[in-house]
Amino acid sequence: MTGGGRAALALQPRGRLWPLLAVLAAVAGCVRAAMDECADEGGRPQRCMPEFVNAAFNVTVVATNTCGTPPEEYCVQTGVTGVTKSCHLCDAGQQHLQHGAAFLTDYNNQADTTWWQSQTMLAGVQYPNSINLTLHLGKAFDITYVRLKFHTSRPESFAIYKRTREDGPWIPYQYYSGSCENTYSKANRGFIRTGGDEQQALCTDEFSDISPLTGGNVAFSTLEGRPSAYNFDNSPVLQEWVTATDIRVTLNRLNTFGDEVFNEPKVLKSYYYAISDFAVGGRCKCNGHASECVKNEFDKLMCNCKHNTYGVDCEKCLPFFNDRPWRRATAESASESLPCDCNGRSQECYFDPELYRSTGHGGHCTNCRDNTDGAKCERCRENFFRLGNTEACSPCHCSPVGSLSTQCDSYGRCSCKPGVMGDKCDRCQPGFHSLTEAGCRPCSCDLRGSTDECNVETGRCVCKDNVEGFNCERCKPGFFNLESSNPKGCTPCFCFGHSSVCTNAVGYSVYDISSTFQIDEDGWRVEQRDGSEASLEWSSDRQDIAVISDSYFPRYFIAPVKFLGNQVLSYGQNLSFSFRVDRRDTRLSAEDLVLEGAGLRVSVPLIAQGNSYPSETTVKYIFRLHEATDYPWRPALSPFEFQKLLNNLTSIKIRGTYSERTAGYLDDVTLQSARPGPGVPATWVESCTCPVGYGGQFCETCLPGYRRETPSLGPYSPCVLCTCNGHSETCDPETGVCDCRDNTAGPHCEKCSDGYYGDSTLGTSSDCQPCPCPGGSSCAIVPKTKEVVCTHCPTGTAGKRCELCDDGYFGDPLGSNGPVRLCRPCQCNDNIDPNAVGNCNRLTGECLKCIYNTAGFYCDRCKEGFFGNPLAPNPADKCKACACNPYGTVQQQSSCNPVTGQCQCLPHVSGRDCGTCDPGYYNLQSGQGCERCDCHALGSTNGQCDIRTGQCECQPGITGQHCERCETNHFGFGPEGCKPCDCHHEGSLSLQCKDDGRCECREGFVGNRCDQCEENYFYNRSWPGCQECPACYRLVKDKAAEHRVKLQELESLIANLGTGDDMVTDQAFEDRLKEAEREVTDLLREAQEVKDVDQNLMDRLQRVNSSLHSQISRLQNIRNTIEETGILAERARSRVESTEQLIEIASRELEKAKMAAANVSITQPESTGEPNNMTLLAEEARRLAERHKQEADDIVRVAKTANETSAEAYNLLLRTLAGENQTALEIEELNRKYEQAKNISQDLEKQAARVHEEAKRAGDKAVEIYASVAQLTPVDSEALENEANKIKKEAADLDRLIDQKLKDYEDLREDMRGKEHEVKNLLEKGKAEQQTADQLLARADAAKALAEEAAKKGRSTLQEANDILNNLKDFDRRVNDNKTAAEEALRRIPAINRTIAEANEKTREAQLALGNAAADATEAKNKAHEAERIASAVQKNATSTKADAERTFGEVTDLDNEVNGMLRQLEEAENELKRKQDDADQDMMMAGMASQAAQEAELNARKAKNSVSSLLSQLNNLLDQLGQLDTVDLNKLNEIEGSLNKAKDEMKASDLDRKVSDLESEARKQEAAIMDYNRDIAEIIKDIHNLEDIKKTLPTGCFNTPSIEKP
């Protein structure tokens, strides 16, 4: 059974509670099924609730008082006077004796009852001291009942409070008291009338009887007595009333039999609070929008919300469900939150009350997408437009300067001012600048040097690359010849790189180098791509030359010599020719026109520079010889490199064939140049201003006395002065080599010839003399001593005459110290620095410079203070430092065992380096060994101590270095440590107790802790300590002793009361009792009559009230800062506390007076039965006095509550006004009012002092004062609270206004964020479009290069490219073509196999050519896979396809460049290695043969050339169409993709992949052979260079030379 179920069974309601709970139970049974689900069977929302539970079950209750700490005795109340009570021990430290708060909410087992218990009345548990039991539910619950089961008698007075939020105030729920009016100022068993305040707490004495003594129940129903309980769904007041997050039970007063007044300890121990069960029945509050509560990630309870709500209690609508206000679900309506209608353009909205009132829909959309606006995002924002109702709104972006209006038309076009253009009127028209309110002004640019455009802001012209000036009217430094036809504007100075200053040369005219073929072929010839000759045909009829191709490989027209050589004067000019083909089946390449020279090579496709495709009609092609990007020569060269190429032009190649078995016809070839002489001026020829040492028009020669600094560079080399050191007057102007004499040598006569020594740089004929060395070996002169020494001694020897061992060697080569010993290397076990000098003794071989911490004759041991293996190969594994700890080592030795490294340790010291003490020892720093810790066996925790101080680790409360004694103010030394004495600082003579824990008390104090006053002593706050009561109280003490004796007799009589058979009647006793009642009644009447006696005090209080009202009216316009008002409030609070202390003193004096009155002697009758009757009379009088005291206490409580309420209202007012501006006048006025209040407060203190004195004289006067003070409360608290609420309301309105402004700001910010995002997108789109435009020509060229490469690489690549185009343009027709092409490829596989076999037979003889063919085949397959990948990607992302295509084009171009680079490297190797010329020629011949043999393998590739013209145009269209694939028929595309996959499967079935793989394998073998060949060439070149360097360093004669290995 759950906790909630047990609680329900345990609750037995009675009285009015039972009918209401019965009704609620019936209703719950009817709707149980409905409450479980938040939607009915049809999916319609309905009210749902979590299950009914005991919310308190196993929830921790916080109790402010619990017995057992320290252990204490309590007695069970029997209710029979005189009977010996059963006493027990409450000890929180023992499980079976503890009664903690956890027992309040555990399982309530009737057979084994557990309960919470407070301390007894002996410990001060009684009114006015209260105990709070606080239950934190964790979240809001709808509370049905609160039930308490008491283990002792129910309290006389207790209250139940609740909080509706965890940080909110405590609200009274219900009061239970036998004195409702006096204790809680509530009417007993009051009720709520219809229309009354249904959130008020009631009070009843129904459960305040002292019986039963155990097991009494108190059940509080939250809806009992509430008129609207049966209309709960429509009562927000009761919905708030049953809501609680916390429940608090405040126990105010115990129920007693009255015998506690005699302070008998055993009696006091029998009075205490004890509760066995604390149950709270209810449901997790979810407002009808959830059927369960769950724990979140923070282990907090919250509702599992439905109906589009959220929040801990489902108290809010989800962010997008604000179409109507949130409501609590009812039985009639689920009140689910409805979504906002934003037309699909927003996911955010808020509830707009005004919109809801006007339209019935309150969802106001925010952050509308697509630049829309309106409550439902139904219209475009201002200055936006859209073409259709379903389209997104686009910003007009009309320029505020260039447009006539910021609003555009329905197409987004703005109205522009004069000279302004663009849809947005944001830029000047071409040729205009300086956009202003009046429009744009025209530019004034020099058309020769500008693009006819100028800066739209400043009017500064946009110059060509090599032009400068505001109007682009002059060339930049280093450039000349400003002309409009030059895309760069000016031509860079060439001058062979020696000068950057040049001008237009005078005397040059235009000259055309041409071939018209009127007589013959004019020296032109034809080559194949591999360089082999091919036939050329000259037609006398057509007067042109032709070439016919019988294979796929292209053939080139080769220009004659007159077009070659120094053609630098053609830089920037045109090369033109007329060309046609016999059929349009053409496939272009990136090398249709090739220029070579000076080690450089450039090429362009035939259609570059705006030329058209070749056709049957003769077309004139014009190519500008310039490096600008407008003329895409590849690779790109710098201006200097391009002119360098033309300065030594070695080859012009024009491609003649573009497909298999086609012919190409060439005519009218013209190269524009210049020459000296009359004619049309050639302004592009330069005349350089040369620096010193240079001559010639172009600075191409060195003047006399100068030479080339780098002869191999020719005219490009700088000119420097000849350097011959005085041994020659002439030098070669090109190489700079001097014609030396006087036994000198070197290019500059900078050294003596072999066998001679001296300084040839002195410039005399006797600079070089013969060497004095035997055998004529080379020698040198020591600069300082001028001594001649030999320079080529044998290895290991040294000295002026090679008579000594060299450094690093030892021996006696001349036998000067004994027998002859040859020089040998030093033997030091690799423990020396090979780069050091003097590692060993040159005579004995003793090692002198051992490293790695080694020593010994051969560095074969570790030196002192180190250990390890000196012969280890790794230096890190050799000798390491001992690093002995000087404090733990015998005599502080630094040495150790040379092998193990163990140091010699002192006693009780351990570790290799003697750095630690043995366990249980310390003080290593003493240097005498470690000392024993000697920790006390009981006082220490583990016997260990601090290794430095020796301090042991002690048990709690124990101290001393060895843990041998208790700490100060502790006792009980033992294994668990020492316990604190805890002596009271005022009552004990010393804070140190005795061995048994008892403290020595001062006079008047008693108790183990000296924390209680002795009998007939009292505690005085103003004078700390227990003071003896006045002498008159001794009589009271004596009387108390007498009464104790009488009380014992009375208890004895009561115990024997039931043993007699007859009842005793005593008329005298009854009369006396009535007289006592009359006296007490008169006393009460007099106390009530004197309430209005002190009119002076009431007048003062009235003035205080008036003053406070005046302050309230002034404070409505005052706004204080928190700091100032906090100081004032603190001072007022101090005054209130002082007044409370005075009232408390008066209360104690009243208590003393009451006790004295209770002890007044009453004359006893002489009758035998009278003693018993008189005792009863005294008891009755005591009860009356107790009741009067209770009334006085109630008056005090009311006064105190009024004071606190006034202080709270005042503080609330101050907090409400915090943060506002405050003027100096208002501060002064407030200070004045405060001084008045302070004076009044001082008067109140004086009045309270007077009350104190009167209370000492008579208790009745104290009652009068308390009653007067109680009348202060209603006036001040209500007025202050009303004013505070008014100002609080104003602050709340201001907060709502601020929230609205913040919301508007957030809306504006989100709107601007959307605009920013749109602007960024437009900028990115503009950049992308600009890049696309900039790269358009490059893409076209790349497309052409791809087409030519596809034709060259094989039929499969072109077929895949055609598949892509067919899939995009003509799906149905292209499917059949794909299938036919695949079958064609299958039929040609045998021809490929035959070609592979023939190529394999000639592999060794034609490595280069076959390697190229294999590479082509590999690339063919790669391109096929690449095309397949691109086709797949096009279906997903058109932009990715374009990027892949561009990257593929770049890879093809790079591949061609790499092949060309390899060819150039081979040519260089052939030039440098003349002895292999014949082999190279043979290789070229074999390559030609291999090419012939490989033609059959490439027949399929040539067939693909038939459709090259249409392919090129289609590819150009493809670039435009790839960005417009939004309307592609995906179904059709998927169908075509299936057909394509089917065709691929058929190709795979033909085993083409395996055959291509075999070809790839063979290609890899050939590539490896080529790489080996290249490596051999590189090594040979290095060897040659090495030999040349050696030759330069050798003297003319050598008498002791080692053999040189030949390359």
Curated annotation (Swiss-Prot):
Q: Which residues form the signal peptide?
A: 1-33
Q: Give the GO cellular component terms, alphabetically.
A: basement membrane; collagen-containing extracellular matrix; extracellular region; laminin-10 complex; neuromuscular junction; protein complex involved in cell-matrix adhesion; synaptic cleft
Q: Which GO terms describe its molecular function?
A: extracellular matrix structural constituent; glycosphingolipid binding
Gene Ontology biological process terms, A to Z: cell adhesion; cell migration; chromatin organization; extracellular matrix disassembly; gene expression; hair cell differentiation; hair follicle cell proliferation; hair follicle morphogenesis
Task: Please report the stretch or stretches of sequence annotated as the Laminin EGF-like domain.
Answer: 284-339, 340-395, 396-442, 443-492, 493-502, 688-721, 722-770, 771-825, 826-881, 882-932, 933-980, 981-1028
* InterPro entries found in the cross-reference section: EGF-like_dom, Laminin/Netrin_ECM, Laminin_IV, Laminin_N, LE_dom, LMN_ATRN_NET-like_EGF
Cystine residue pairs: 284-293, 286-303, 305-314, 340-349, 342-365, 368-377, 380-393, 396-408, 398-414, 416-425, 428-440, 443-454, 445-461, 463-472, 475-490, 722-731, 724-738, 740-749, 752-768, 771-779, 773-790, 793-802, 805-823, 826-840, 828-847, 850-859, 862-879, 882-896, 884-903, 905-914, 917-930, 933-945, 935-952, 954-963, 966-978, 981-993, 983-999, 1001-1010, 1013-1026
According to the UniProt entry, which residues carry Phosphoserine?
1147, 1491
- By its UniProt entry, which Pfam families does this protein fall under? EGF_laminin, EGF_LMN_ATRN, Laminin_B, Laminin_N
Q: Indicate the segments forming the Laminin IV type A domain, all copies.
A: 512-687
Name the chain's protein: Laminin subunit gamma-1
